């Protein structure tokens, strides 16, 4: 059952949909994985990971956007990607993560490109950023592959030091 009014976005191999209760355990498992969740700045205990999932549901209701669940066309939950802009964020961010076993298949790239197109075409954003923890080389490479360029570093009150990458305007992504 959908927990938000998120649209259903399709790409060549993926379905991006709003969060559902069945997504909670895979998201919590990701957030608590000491290796995989470094890009989120810290490893939360289970209760805080549960609250992050609930926060994303609320984020959709407050802003009309948030993280989509990335689902393969065969029904596997592969990760999350979306637009994130909670209190204290410098501006709307395009974010992505893929879960264990889904790396190296272009899933994050395909999902993030589809979300960015939706944000530009349907939400009217002129630009987006991606905030990346230093040392997250895979996310840096993905941001650069999408045409984003490093703009500055800043201290994110939730995640510590972040590198802000600026995505090109819609016209440059066509």
Where does each model-flagged region fall?
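Acyl-donor (CoA/ACP) binding surface of acyl/acetyltransferases
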Residues: 1-39, 54, 67-174
């Amino acid at each position: 059952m959908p927990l938000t009014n998120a649209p259903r976005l399709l790409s060549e191999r993926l379905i991006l949909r709003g969060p559902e209760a069945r997504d909670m355990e895979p998201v919590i498992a990701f957030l608590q994985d000491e290796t995989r969740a470094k890009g989120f700045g810290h490893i939360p205990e289970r209760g805080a990971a549960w609250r992050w999932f609930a926060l994303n549901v609320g984020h959709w209701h407050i802003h009309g956007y948030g993280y989509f669940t990335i689902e393969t066309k065969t029904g596997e939950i592969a990760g999350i990607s979306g637009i994130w802009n909670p209190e204290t964020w410098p501006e709307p961010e395009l974010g992505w993560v893929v879960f264990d076993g889904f790396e190296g298949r272009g899933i994050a790239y395909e999902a993030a490109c589809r979300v960015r197109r939706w944000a530009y075409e349907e939400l009217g954003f002129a630009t987006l950023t991606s905030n990346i923890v230093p040392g997250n080389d895979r996310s840096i490479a993905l941001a650069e592959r999408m045409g984003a360029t490093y703009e500055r570093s800043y201290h994110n009150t939730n995640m510590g030091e972040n590198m802000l990458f600026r995505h090109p305007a819609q016209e440059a992504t066509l």
